[in-house]
Amino acid sequence: VSPFKASNLSSSWYMTGSGAPVGVGQAFQAFASGIAPDADMGPFILKPENGKVIRYLRGRPCDLSVEESVSEALSSFDSLSGRYDLVVCEGSGSPAELNLKGSDIANMRMVRERDIPAVIVGDIERGGVFAAIYGTWKLMPEEERRHLRGFIINRFRGDISVLNPGIEELESMTGMRCF
């Protein structure tokens, strides 16, 4: 199993054995999977520097078009897919940010390009988890929803029965399972 995140906003990175950086999160996930971190696990790193965000591709500053960026991200994903039985793709932020639809390479673009099954993960600690999950689902066009396999509510602690009415309503409204 290999982690993958096409684009990662991070102020630090981990240097791989080949000398190319990868996001610290992807390095940690790789170690947890028992494999060595690889730059293909996170080809793009957006690093805040001096009040700006500098975009790096495998450790080198870059200024690529969206299509060139997608091509690079797909190349990294394909490389990992050829070496591992399973590649777990992590998105970045929300897959339904209307203002970023045309330039987002880390979320549904990867899913659509490689027909990757997806789940929406909602963070209960931020509050409004059912509204966030349902709103995200509702904003997604049907061509993207067809890739969804369900929802996950993250960071819940306590008696799960407290969530059951909300889970049942969410599943009824969307026809999708909440895991």
Predicted feature locations:
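Flexible phosphate-sensing "switch/lid" loops adjacent to ATP/NTP-binding sites
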Residues: 1-179
